[in-house]
Amino acid sequence: MIDLLDLHTHTIASGHAYNTLYEMAQSAAEKGLALYGCSEHAPAMPGSCHKFYFSNFDVIPRVIRGIPVLMGTELNILDHTGRVDLEEHYLQKIDYAIASLHTPCIDNHGTVSDYTNAYLGVMENPLIHIIGHPDDSRLPADWTAVAAAAAKHHKLLELNSHSLAPNSSRKGARENYEQLLTACMRYGTSIIIDSDAHCENDVGNHEMAHRLLADLHFPEELVVNPSLSKAAAFIPSLARLL
């Protein structure tokens, strides 16, 4: 499978990543990607940047080291209604938004129903484009319901390659993805593969994700990574680059 993009990455601005924006873009260019996306953690993540950071993306060149760049965010889902940690004013200024559950940012004692409702609620927000790493058994959800809702609301579900790595802190990712991806095939839900890179060497590292898709015989037509125009159908700012 041709893999042209990586939209879930972090730089030093996120507080626990280790390279600059220019270094990450350089790595993406060297690895032959056609598009690089930077998605810093939104403010509720301990140590991340202030919300004002997301209001000044106009100063950033949209081609860096020869590769087109999108500037987005990884929002934190804060409660079981799907509330997130950047206001609409900021979301309208950025290129795209990923919304994810993170253990430091939400009650860790919820039920499957609670976390499912969190995902379903956030998908009703038209300014959110991708659901990040829906795979963590510490924050379990009804993955079939999540896949069905993503198809209904025209959201991309992320297959996070880092979640599948042996050193990942997320629990049960492969088993959860097997359920989620099976449901995606049932409902025709599109997915995006991302690295979740916090260091330049991991930009575009989608190896674990590709292995899982091959094991499941997942249809390539439901993966947006081989086609920028296919991804642009979910991310309007990308359409403006084509």
Task: List the model feature ranges, each with a label.
Residues 34-35, 156, 190, 219:
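Residue-level detector of anion-binding/catalytic polar loops
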Residues 4-14, 38-41, 131-135, 195-197:
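Histidine-centered catalytic micro-motifs
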Residues 156-169:
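His/Asp/Glu-enriched short active-site or ligand-binding loop at hydrolase and phosphoryl-transfer sites
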Residues 15-18, 47-51, 140-147, 167-183, ...:
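Histidine/acidic-residue-rich catalytic or RNA/ligand-binding cores of hydrolases
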Residues 162, 181, 194, 198:
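C-terminal active-site rim and adjoining tail of enzyme catalytic domains
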Residues 29, 42, 47-159, 214-223, ...:
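Extended substrate/RNA-proximal surfaces in nucleic-acid metabolism proteins
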Residues 189-203:
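Short acidic/histidine-rich active-site segments
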Residues 13-48:
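Metal-associated gating/positioning segment near the N- to mid-region
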